[in-house]
């Protein structure tokens, strides 16, 4: 099948499409995009389940590490105030992990923006295609109404005026038959009229889902950013309660990161299968939803010299009929108007209607050509298979960096918390120190008493 203009499957599409797939019984599953097949659905669920497996392993590792830290920690000698060896290394490991998490957040914001741009391009292509299809229906309806009105009024009046000349009446009736032929042929060109599938509705649904997806990822990114910043603040101020709260929040964000990773991985794999060969699936789905013939769908989705225009015969007959009407009106204007002056007004009105109809007909021919809709199809594929897929991969990288950084933080924070000095140590500060909290409190009380 011919590829849409400007679209070629990317290297990421080929790489993800070649990954092996298996169902729940670990039997191989073809990589062809078939979301309606149960085995293919199981294969995507299994890809998402790998993230759940990673979450379980990371939680087990964190639990074992913390249990070992709590149970196997050597007792501190009484009266010891100096931190044990390696304490600074633990703190710096935690800070490094938080910085990696912050870098992952930047990657996540970029990936979220790329995904949103790709979906926006898809929606714009659908809206433009809907505009083209609506314009075709509108032009056909307008031309048919004009021709029917001309048959009912001007041509009927012209036949009544020319009753004394049978050959002129025959010419007027010939123009009537030609106008009826054009109207009949034009009605068959509005191929999208009555089709239940609306590109406008699809674009609105896609935009609605994308708004909530974008917002959900922004909230997740902001939540992780706040966790990283407040954790750094807790380490800097050696605040035990803040570190405890951030430990709980880090565990929550860790679960969310692994969950988003599974969703992103399954979506990226399924999207790569679709983008590797989109024509066949789109053709079959559109034919099922619209009931249109395969000749029309092949013409617009493929748009190459091997596929003929299914409307060419109707367009040719309509153009010939319009040319015949034009020649007949010229003959009537030349023969009938000098003998029947009252025939001039309907003849001029018919010529005006014919000129407007011919202009609309040329515009309709341009809209019916496959170039416009095929260009929209290619734009939609580029948005979905390039920008959106690239954004998903960046979001997948963000989730991976986030999961690794938060797992490291969860292992490091309890050890860093254990190194914080007890609250009694803060009471040993110099009474003359202006930054001493007790001294500051006494200073405020002294000012209020003045």
Swiss-Prot record:
Region Disordered: start-end pairs: 427-450
Membrane disposition: Multi-pass membrane protein
Source organism: Bos taurus
Residues annotated as site: Essential for the formation of the channel-pore: 165
Disulfide bonds: 275-385, 303-370
Superkingdom, natural source: Eukaryota
Membrane spanning stretches: 44-64, 89-109, 215-235, 241-261, 391-411
Primary location group: membrane
GO biological process: cell adhesion; L-glutamate transmembrane transport
Alphabetically ordered keywords of this record: Cell adhesion, Cell membrane, Chloride, Chloride channel, Disulfide bond, Glycoprotein, Ion channel, Ion transport, Membrane, Phosphoprotein, Transmembrane, Transmembrane helix, Transport
This protein's name: Protein tweety homolog 1
Catalysed reactions, semicolon-separated: chloride(in) = chloride(out); L-glutamate(out) = L-glutamate(in)
Subcellular location per the Swiss-Prot or TrEMBL entry: Cell membrane
């Amino acid at each position: 099948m011919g590829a849409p203009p400007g679209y070629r499957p990317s290297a990421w599409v080929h790489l993800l499409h070649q990954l092996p797939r298996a169902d729940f019984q670990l039997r191989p599953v073809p990589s062809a995009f078939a979301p309606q097949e149960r085995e293919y659905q199981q294969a995507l669920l299994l890809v998402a389940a790998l993230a759940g497996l990673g979450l379980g392993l990371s939680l087990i590792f964190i639990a074992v590490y913390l249990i070992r830290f709590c149970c196997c920690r050597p007792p501190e000698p009484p009266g010891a105030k100096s931190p044990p060896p390696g304490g600074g290394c633990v703190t710096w490991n935690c800070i490094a992990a938080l910085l990696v998490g912050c870098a992952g957040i930047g990657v996540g914001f970029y990936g979220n923006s790329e995904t949103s741009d790709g979906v926006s391009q898809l929606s714009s292509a659908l809206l433009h295609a809907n505009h083209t299809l609506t314009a075709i229906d509108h032009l056909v309806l307008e031309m048919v109404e004009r021709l029917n009105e001309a048959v009912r009024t001007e041509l009927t009046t012209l036949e009544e005026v020319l009753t004394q000349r049978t050959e002129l009446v025959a010419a007027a009736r010939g123009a009537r038959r030609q106008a009826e032929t054009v109207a009949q042929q034009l009605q068959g060109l509005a191929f999208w009229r009555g089709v239940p599938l609306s590109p406008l509705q699809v674009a609105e649904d896609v935009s609605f889902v994308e708004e909530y997806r974008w917002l959900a990822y922004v909230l997740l990114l902001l939540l992780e950013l706040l966790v990283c910043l407040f954790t750094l603040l807790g380490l800097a101020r050696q605040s035990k309660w803040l570190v405890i709260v951030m430990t709980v929040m880090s565990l929550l964000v860790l679960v969310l990161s692994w969950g988003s990773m599974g969703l992103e991985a399954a979506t990226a794999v399924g999207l790569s299968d679709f983008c590797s060969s989109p024509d066949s699936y789109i053709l079959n789905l559109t034919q099922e939803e619209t009931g249109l013939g395969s000749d029309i769908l092949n013409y617009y989705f493929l748009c190459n010299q091997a596929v003929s225009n299914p409307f060419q015969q109707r367009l040719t007959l309509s153009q010939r009929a319009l040319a015949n009407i034009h020649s007949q009106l010229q003959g009537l204007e030349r023969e009938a108007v000098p003998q029947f002056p009252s025939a001039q007004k309907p003849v001029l009105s018919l010529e005006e209607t014919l000129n407007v109809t011919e202009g609309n007909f040329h515009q309709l021919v341009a809209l019916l050509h496959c170039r416009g809709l095929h260009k929209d199809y290619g734009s939609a594929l580029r948005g979905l298979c390039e920008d959106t897929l690239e954004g998903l991969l960046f979001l997948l990288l963000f989730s991976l960096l986030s999961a690794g950084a938060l797992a490291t933080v969860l292992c490091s924070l309890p050890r860093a918390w254990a190194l914080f000095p007890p609250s009694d140590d803060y009471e040993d500060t110099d009474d003359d120190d202006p930054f001493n909290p007790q001294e500051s409190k006494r200073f405020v009380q002294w000012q209020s008493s003045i």
